[in-house]
């Protein structure tokens, strides 16, 4: 039985007449959508561009049709078949064979891909998230380039650096990467697909022409990486260069660096697909996890879990790991599953309300996640890796950590300070005043020393002075209309600060 794709927790018991009605409605919706997509394609005049657009719309229609069928079928997972993964389905990093003398040979067969489709809007920035300054004047992109350059120089190899952009990030990224032209690194870029947003009520596409406004389209999640790699021709380019393996990760995960032991393990085990997982903490209980489903390895996301089993899903005892989205692919195998139409990843219906031509409209975006493809590859399994390989920067709370004395940069790689006790990062929660990078920088112009910090919470209008040290648990709360200025040189240890404290400059 297949792992069902969607918000799963509904029990369906339909009569034959209800099924017949649903099937008829599904057929009509599919037929109408097909006509609309054909109309969109007819608005493209250039023959080559039209062919590429038609291919994209065919892929979208396949996704849309599957969505309709699953919606009518009302399928859900059978929780009785869900088990913790077997030892061979998730291998411990400490047990895999260390890379030996063949490292250079294997590296010559490797390419590195960063998912670069996202904007920096959630952190208050304009343009691709990858160009946000992270540390010492370096952006996410800069750090990635430095890592690959060092790898190529150290082993005398040529590992290409590949960026999967979206239509939101492609133009800005093309301008930025020009500065690397003199560097010893081959940079390849391609775009993930551009799919039409769909009206929730009518199930019709929002755009009326292929060049309709940008807000009428969406990038369909990183599960699109397989088809986009193939359709763009990048996969053929890499294979022609002798590349067989691809390491894929989010560009904002500063821990996702090339690991020779994992590459060696992939080659030695003939794995077509590897997923890096790491141990859950209380902060990660909602993350997707690998399961044994009726004897097969599957990715399970919280949205797929029936409501009565959500707490069990969050259990660290039964499901110890979560997906870091550091993935390793065997390129010829990717080409095979795409060309044979074997991919059938779980669909994530992203329903939202957007502003369109001055009005609010309800839309659906059909997305997929690359981790869900694990069940389509041979010898695919997970590797439980150290936490250091998962260091995402999603918020300014994360940014404070990576800018601090907790970490240092070595050839583009972010490494934890060996003087940090326990080797884990403190828990940092910054309030709404710190949501945007510009506001964060204004309130904390100089990053405090946090080597001995366990927990930091700051809410309200709080300003941190220079050369401040934070230790233990520190909570600073400025209530409405109040402001707290932490003086230069302060040492705060295991304290709670509330109220109003203004420091006047003389």
Curated annotation (Swiss-Prot):
SUPFAM superfamilies: Nucleotide-diphospho-sugar transferases (SSF53448)
GO CC aspect terms: cytoplasm; cytosol; nucleus
Superkingdom of the source species: Eukaryota
Reactions accelerated catalytically: alpha-D-glucose 1-phosphate + UTP + H(+) = UDP-alpha-D-glucose + diphosphate
Transferase found in the keyword field: yes
Localization annotation: Cytoplasm; Nucleus
Residues reported in the UniProt entry to bind Mg(2+): 129, 252
Positions bound to UTP: 115-118, 129, 192, 221, 252, 394
Coiled-coil region(s): none
Matching Gene3D superfamilies: Hexapeptide repeat proteins (2.160.10.10), Spore Coat Polysaccharide Biosynthesis Protein SpsA, Chain A (3.90.550.10)
Region (Oligomerization): 455-506
Modified residues (Phosphoserine): 15, 17
Binding-site list for substrate: 117-118, 222, 250-252
Catalytic residues (UniProt): 394
Gene Ontology MF terms: metal ion binding; UTP:glucose-1-phosphate uridylyltransferase activity
Keywords: Cytoplasm, Magnesium, Metal-binding, Nucleotidyltransferase, Nucleus, Phosphoprotein, Transferase
UniProt cross-references to Pfam families, sorted A to Z: UDPGP
Gene Ontology terms describing biological process: glycogen metabolic process; UDP-alpha-D-glucose metabolic process
EC numbers, comma separated: 2.7.7.9
Assembly and interaction partners: Homooctamer.
Family: Belongs to the UDPGP type 1 family.
Reported function: Plays a central role as a glucosyl donor in cellular metabolic pathways.
Name recorded for this polypeptide: Probable UTP--glucose-1-phosphate uridylyltransferase
Lineage summary: Eukaryota, Fungi, Dikarya, Ascomycota, Taphrinomycotina
């Amino acid at each position: 039985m297949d792992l069902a794709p969607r918000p799963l927790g509904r029990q369906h018991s339909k009569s034959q007449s209800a099924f017949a009605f649903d099937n008829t409605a599904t057929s009509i919706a599919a037929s109408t959508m097909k006509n609309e997509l054909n109309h969109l394609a007819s608005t493209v005049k250039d023959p080559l561009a039209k062919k590429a657009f038609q291919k994209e719309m065919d892929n979208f229609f396949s996704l849309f049709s599957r969505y309709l069928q699953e919606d009518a079928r009302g399928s859900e997972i059978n929780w009785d078949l869900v088990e913790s993964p077997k030892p061979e389905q998730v291998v411990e990093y400490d047990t895999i064979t260390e890379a030996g003398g063949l490292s250079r040979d294997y590296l010559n067969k490797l390419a590195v891909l960063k998912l670069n489709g996202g904007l920096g809007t959630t952190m208050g920035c304009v343009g691709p998230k990858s160009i946000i300054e992270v540390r010492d004047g370096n952006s996410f992109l800069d750090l990635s380039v430095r890592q690959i350059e060092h790898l190529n120089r150290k082993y005398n190899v040529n590992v290409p650096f590949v960026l999967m952009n979206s239509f939101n990030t492609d133009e800005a990224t093309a301008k930025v990467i020009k500065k690397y032209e003199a560097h010893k690194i081959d940079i390849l870029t391609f775009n993930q697909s551009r799919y039409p947003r769909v009206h929730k009520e009518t199930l019709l596409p929002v755009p009326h022409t292929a060049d309709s406004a940008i807000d009428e389209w969406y990038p369909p999640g990183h599960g699109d990486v397989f088809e986009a790699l193939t359709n763009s021709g990048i996969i053929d380019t890499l294979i022609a260069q002798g590349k067989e393996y691809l390491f894929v990760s989010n560009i904002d995960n500063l821990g996702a660096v090339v690991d020779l032991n994992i590459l060696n393990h992939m080659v030695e085990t003939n794995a077509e697909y590897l997923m890096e997982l790491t141990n859950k903490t209380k902060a990660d209980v909602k993350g997707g996890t690998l399961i044994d489903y009726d004897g097969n390895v599957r990715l399970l996301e919280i949205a797929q879990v029936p409501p009565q089993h959500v707490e069990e899903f969050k259990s660290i005892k039964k499901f110890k790991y979560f997906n870091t989205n550091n993935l390793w692919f065997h390129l010829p195998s990717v080409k095979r599953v795409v060309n044979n139409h074997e991919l059938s990843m779980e669909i994530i219906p992203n329903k939202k309300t957007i502003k369109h031509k001055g009005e609010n409209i309800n839309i659906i975006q059909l997305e997929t996640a690359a981790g869900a493809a694990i069940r389509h590859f041979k010898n695919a399994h997970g590797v439980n890796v150290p936490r250091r390989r998962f260091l995402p920067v999603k918020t300014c709370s994360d940014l404070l950590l990576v800018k601090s004395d907790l970490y240092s940069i070595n050839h583009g790689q972010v490494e934890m300070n060996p003087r940090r006790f326990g080797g884990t990062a403190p828990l940092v929660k910054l309030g709404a005043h710190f949501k945007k990078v510009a506001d964060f920088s204004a309130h904390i112009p100089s990053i405090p020393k946090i080597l001995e910090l366990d927990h930091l919470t700051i809410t309200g209008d709080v300003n941190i002075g220079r050369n401040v040290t934070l230790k233990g648990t520190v909570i600073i709360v400025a209530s409405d209309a109040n402001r707290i200025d932490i003086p230069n040189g302060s040492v705060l240890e295991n304290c709670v600060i509330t109220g109003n404290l203004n420091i006047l400059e003389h």
